Amino acid sequence: MSDHAINEHPSRILNTIEKIRFWKNGLAEELELLFRKQCEDTFTLQAINIEVDTQDENKIEEVRIYLSTPAFDKTILTSACITVRSYYPSQPPIVQLLDEKGGKHKYTSLLLQLWKNERSVFNIYRLVQALIKQDFEREHTSPPELPTKLVNTIEKLKVKEENEAPPVIPAKPFSSSSEQHFRKVPALPSKLPPKPLKITANSSLGQETNSNSSSFQSTLFSLNTAPFSATSQQLVHDSVSLRRPSSNIPAQKPIPPKPEQNEIIITKDTPSLKDKYSKPALLPQKPKVSKGQIVQQVSVFSTGKKIESQSLLNLIDTDIETPLKGSSELLYSEDFKPNVDPVKIQQILHKQNKIIEEKWISQIRISKNLEVKQRLLDQERHALETLAKNIENNRFILGKRRRKAREALQKLDNLKDLSVQELFIIPSERELKYYELKRKDEKLDEGIRALNQALHHESIMPASWLKGIKLLARQQFLIRDEMLQYS
């Protein structure tokens, strides 16, 4: 057989162990223990062979045990070969490590060196335990392979990322009408801070000032880009709400500086934004009736008395001011723009893939361990069933021998009661023939009882029992018929 052993079926390994039992019973028991203790997490028996040593002149038979262990997974080693010769256990076995290319590596350890001094302590199972606990040099290491579905998913994501371009952030829209309407104020250089825009107290925008011209331009942009369904009053209100001061300090009247070139000053004569964008006057609307007035009218109509307490009515009519921002600021504020980081997405994807991979590997390990445990439980159950049958057979044999011993003792007791004359009487030929037929009849009767007990314990099949009973009954009938002639 080649050095690289093929994984044999467990039944074939057990048959080989039974053959070794006729050669060396102690070695067979050690191999049986090794077969029961094997597991995929520790070691696995590949084959047990009985071979002849061709290098020896006497051609002595030897036993070779091939096994593999998870310690060989990331190395060039594939299996270990333990050779047990005829002088075992006085001499230690020979251990060789086999690699992928068919090479052999000698294995030495302290256990093998101390074997001769402590033969009663060391055995093959302890040798295998020392072998699987040793760390071997890891060569040709490679990362663990992912499942095929997960690999395909990751490759698709990589190809998709390479084909897709990075997201383009759209530039802020700008309207040319606002620049033409306000005399095309030229933009200042980016390095210099913008000049403040002065607004007088009599302007249509109220007693409010803005710190820079960029906020004023954003106000004009919100007016030009607002939805068409909104009225001009709402647009002006939204633009003013953007510049509402956070504190309640009354605004002081600013001192108007001298007008400079390219600067706009809004006065009474300057047309206001409200007049520019206002629609023609609508018809006068009817005054709205508040909820409190409706409740008061209903109570007066039903009871005839006016409600004095105005707390509930005041709560109904009161308008609660909320510090909400305008719609234009919510739509075009840079704080609300989505922030997409491709590096962070890659990190999250890698983390999720790693979690999925660990779960799959743990499930595979659990399933394999359960399969090995189930196989070992089946083997133990089969062994227990065989042991129970052997115990029943031994009980049956012991009972049979006990009955024979009891009958022999009874015969001895009967002989003790006989006199000397009766003991030394020489029987005739007729009597001897009768006694011989009687002994045969007793033996056939014992055989019939044994068959009945075996059928009761389900040790034999009913067809075999019926065949045996017919044969014994026929012989017993013939013997008893012959006994009648000599009686």
UniProtKB/Swiss-Prot annotation:
Keyword tRNA processing: no
GO cellular component, one term: late endosome membrane
Any matching Pfam family: Vps23_core
The keyword Nuclease appears for this protein: no
Keywords on record: Cytoplasm, Endosome, Membrane, Protein transport, Transport
Entries under Gene3D superfamilies matching the protein: 6.10.140.820
Predominant cellular place of this UniProt entry's protein: cytoplasm
Database matches in InterPro entries: ESCRT_assembly_dom, SB_dom
Cleaved signal peptide residues: none
Membrane disposition: Peripheral membrane protein
Disulfide pattern: none
Domain of life where this protein originates: Eukaryota
SUPFAM superfamilies: Endosomal sorting complex assembly domain
GO biological process, one term: endocytosis
Domain annotation SB: ranges: 428-487
Places the protein is found: Cytoplasm; Endosome; Late endosome membrane
Assembly: Component of the ESCRT-I complex (endosomal sorting complex required for transport I).
Protein function: Component of the ESCRT-I complex, a regulator of vesicular trafficking process. Binds to ubiquitinated cargo proteins and is required for the sorting of endocytic ubiquitinated cargos into multivesicular bodies (MVBs). Mediates the association to the ESCRT-0 complex.
Protein name per its UniProtKB record: ESCRT-I complex subunit vps23
Protein's organism: Schizosaccharomyces pombe (strain 972 / ATCC 24843) (Fission yeast)
